[in-house]
């Protein structure tokens, strides 16, 4: 086997020695406070806005690492989860979790993405986070994922973000110039270099969000990786379309949209909103430069667009059903997201208090009208206010949307 073969190349050798992410010892304990972003038990309406959660999904985790596939199998017991990876130590830990938690629905394979077709399987959900940007040919990898996707299925992917990782790329270039490798001496030098950075270095902002860099494996994966690249918005979309897929949307939308929820009368944001969608996303990623990862969904071209298209620009959006996203909600007069909270206006709060996962925006506006709070305005005015409010909250990742049943 040659050194450039996916089973034996520099990336495979790295993950054989440096196990990453950090292995989870107990899934029951971990899932009390944590969750996987693309896990359908939490996020099915983001993946499939047109349908309820389906427990018997066929799920592929392409590049499962140490924990991810076992987490999906643990939280989706009726699903069939197939996992592939190039790291035997990572798969060994997945096997440990499978045995510990009785995950009969988890199937493990030592297999690179480039050889995915040898499984001869197709899937409802294909998850690949943190893998494609390490491949020798990411386009070929994305095509492999596309080829095993069912018509109504979803590819859920993560790629490194170019602007949020500028500090990482600067340090990586320094370490390459110094000839650092993945040995203990190189790791020691890298740690010292990071400790010497001035407060204004671009990496400092990244370090405030990267909580796992205390481990040597995480440091190697971030700064001393054998092969990696970062992507802009437009490059993410291009990678999707190069595989014959359609870009379905962002999983985390907040970094890609202007937010009139906070600045309601901004002329600049109004100008951004007039741009074509991909161009607007590109503009915003160059302003919101802390976004180090792109999480997005893609699907087949023959999947009906009405199954996944969210469009608040017409009155048809009044038939959307808003649902709180994971760990989002209302407490007293506050609204909260993971990690922060704020006080909405009384008018906004009146709408938020009516969200129950069943009422449409139209019905919520009717409830607000009947309560008389906030006072003033016709029902049509309240419906317009609600439509714009829930568009803002959807862009802020506070709510997901359930589309009305077709037919």
From Swiss-Prot:
Any one cellular-component term (Gene Ontology): plasma membrane
GO molecular function: methyltransferase activity
Name of the molecule in the record: Uncharacterized protein Rv2067c
Organism whose genome encodes this protein: Mycobacterium tuberculosis (strain ATCC 25618 / H37Rv)
